[in-house]
Amino acid sequence: MDEIRYPIGKFQAPAAFCEEDAKQWISDIRQIPAKLWEAVSGLNEEQLNTPYRDGGWTVAQVVHHIADASMNAFLRTKWTLTEDVPSIKPFEENDWAKTTEARSLHIEPSLQLLEGLHERWAHLLESMSSDDFQRNFYHEGTKENVPLYVLIAMHAWHGKHHTAQIVSLRQRKGWN
């Protein structure tokens, strides 16, 4: 089950900031929309409404979730760059995945949103200094200060993680 749920493994937070790692995270963030488009290309409505695992979200819900999470992460980035240790509220991703548009809207609006958002986010990240990446926000859910570089690393992993779930489902089902 872990291979299905975590096809690229669980997220491992970096212990320290490294500029070379940051370049890779930014590249990953920029590429997520194209890789996600490729992963869902040619899927019909029935396939889009198939859970990627037993008890998991449907492919469409995963796509909408990536958009939700990316919007949150982009805003967290902006707040962290413009405020002194802003307090960030967590979002209840399972509840968000049950909202009407996450359950019934076609995936194209979320894919289009991701294209523009990730291009904008990557552009912002490329302009940041080493000190910017080490700025912190306070996460109300974990009650911890989180460095921005950890958020960026996590979201680079996050997009690849969910895209791999969809690719894995396609392989298991023979949806080539």
From Swiss-Prot:
Keywords: Cytoplasm, Hydrolase, Metal-binding, Zinc
Membership in a protein family: Belongs to the metal hydrolase YfiT family.
Residues noted as binding Zn(2+) in the record, renumbered to the chain: 65, 158, 162
Details of cofactor binding: Binds 1 zinc ion per subunit.
Complex and partners: Homodimer.
Compartments, record wording: Cytoplasm
Top-level enzyme category: hydrolase
Name this protein carries in UniProt: Putative metal-dependent hydrolase GWCH70_0602
Function as written in the Swiss-Prot or TrEMBL entry: Possible metal-dependent hydrolase.
One Gene Ontology term, aspect cellular component: cytoplasm
Superkingdom assignment: Bacteria
Pfam families: DinB_2
NCBIfam families xrefs: PRK13291.1
Cofactor(s) recorded in Swiss-Prot or TrEMBL: Zn(2+)
Keyword Metal-binding: yes
One GO molecular-function entry: zinc ion binding
EC number: 3.-.-.-
